[in-house]
Amino acid sequence: VTINVNYIYKENELIYLLDNADAEAVFFQGCYSERIKAIKDQLPKIKVYIQIDDGTEPLMEGAIDYESSISSSKEQKRFDRTEENIYMLYTGGTTGMPKGVMYKHGGFIPSMLKTAFAMGFEVPEDISDLEKIVKNAKENDSLSVSLPACPLMHGTGMWLGAFLPMFSGGTVVTISDLGLDPKKVWEEVVKNKVNSLVIVGDAF
């Protein structure tokens, strides 16, 4: 079960969040390595740290390089999910520390599909219909090209900005810069012909 982590959290918030989630693996960009170093000794449940090289810091001692871990890994057997499997999203902690909200796949996925329908997406009756729907949308040049202008650790950014387009064969455009740069956002909109811009005003 993966969880979202707010990139602006300080050490005490990160310790609480990762401990509360019973996290066993942490993926982090190199620019956050100093913050991770400062808390790793207080997180005994973490079994592995995987660092994504962003050109800012050398590989943290004890961490595994993300790209190397992929290239050296063997193909894993596929395992089936059930409706009882959990997807967990941590709240923003505006009324105390963040809370882990658990959604069963059997309830979350139908809810997302209903949202997709309300937004104009064609929802398949059966998974076997999905390929046809995506093919038709591509031929009609109506596939979603979404830019989540709010952080992906926010539910709105992840659900509306990323999940829905991916569910329907669309494209998700991301911006590598932290924070909100309106000029950069509009440059990406024009460059990638974005037709869905998702934003939350106070989530930066």
Q: Residues of each region from the PLM?
A:
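Conserved helix-loop-beta element of the AMP-binding
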Residues: 22-24, 41-53, 76, 144-147, ...
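Conserved AMP-binding A3 loop
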Residues: 86-126
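Conserved AMP-binding/adenylation subdomain of ANL enzymes
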Residues: 109-149, 153-196
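Residue-level signal for inorganic ion chemistry
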Residues: 17, 26, 49, 169, ...
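Structural core segment of the AMP-binding/adenylate-forming
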Residues: 1-68, 80
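ATP-dependent adenylate-forming carboxylate-activation enzymes
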Residues: 3-16, 30-32, 172-191, 201
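Conserved pre-ATP/AMP-binding loop-to-beta segment of ANL
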Residues: 72-92, 96-97, 135-145
